[in-house]
A protein has these predicted regions:
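Basic/polar N-terminal segments that are highly enriched at the extreme N-terminus
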Residues: 1-5, 10, 179-187
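Residues at structural and domain junctions
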Residues: 14, 21, 33, 83-86, ...
């Protein structure tokens, strides 16, 4: 019996080690999950503070109220060479969505966080300014200009559609119904 004692003690020691390391790994995983949740909360708060700030909202609202007949009219009234205030507002809003789109594309931000913080705004602004952005892509800034903003708006459009923000057949007069030709041009 005594000859088995070292084997039993070794087995008990090994079992204790395995249990200890399992406990350490479990605690580390729980700490990592808490840290991820904290980062998600901080990121969500940061995005909400940016997009919910008075300055951003003022710029956003003013961009939704600009009026133009066609691209030439837009350029005469709002191009950066004639209206630096409008340009600054556009750049502030567009770049916020461009950066959020980059984070989404790279998998660095949760799409639910973005949907809650930016979905309707980016869809509306993209829908309104897509022809202007296309003009700048073709004439001045190249095909990749605001590609992450476009990606974000397209992904948010899909989520809006899945959640009932867009009516079936685009015929119920919902706010986004008028934008379907931008996001689904073949329909």
């Amino acid at each position: 019996m005594i000859e088995y004692l070292p084997l039993v003690l070794t087995g008990l020691g090994l079992t204790a080690s395995i249990l200890y390391y399992t406990s350490v790994l479990r605690n580390a995983n729980e700490a990592q999950k808490r840290a991820q949740e904290t980062r998600r909360t901080q990121l969500s708060t940061s995005i909400t503070e940016k997009i919910g700030s008075k300055d951003f909202l003022r710029d956003f609202i003013e961009l939704t109220q600009l009026e133009w007949i066609d691209i030439d009219d837009f350029l005469k009234k709002y191009d950066h060479t004639v209206n630096t205030e409008s340009y600054a507002q556009r750049w502030t809003v567009w770049m916020a969505y461009e950066n959020l789109g980059y984070l989404l594309r790279e998998g660095l931000i949760d799409r639910e966080i973005l949907f809650n913080a930016a979905s309707t705004g980016c869809v509306l602004i993209w829908g309104r300014y897509q022809p202007v952005i296309d003009y700048y892509r073709k004439r001045q800034l190249g095909p990749r200009f605001m590609e992450n903003f476009e990606y974000l708006a397209t992904e948010m459009w899909k989520m809006c559609k899945n959640r009932g923000y867009i009516s079936p057949g685009y015929k119920d007069g919902f706010l986004f119904d008028t934008l379907h030709h931008i996001f689904e041009p073949t329909t």
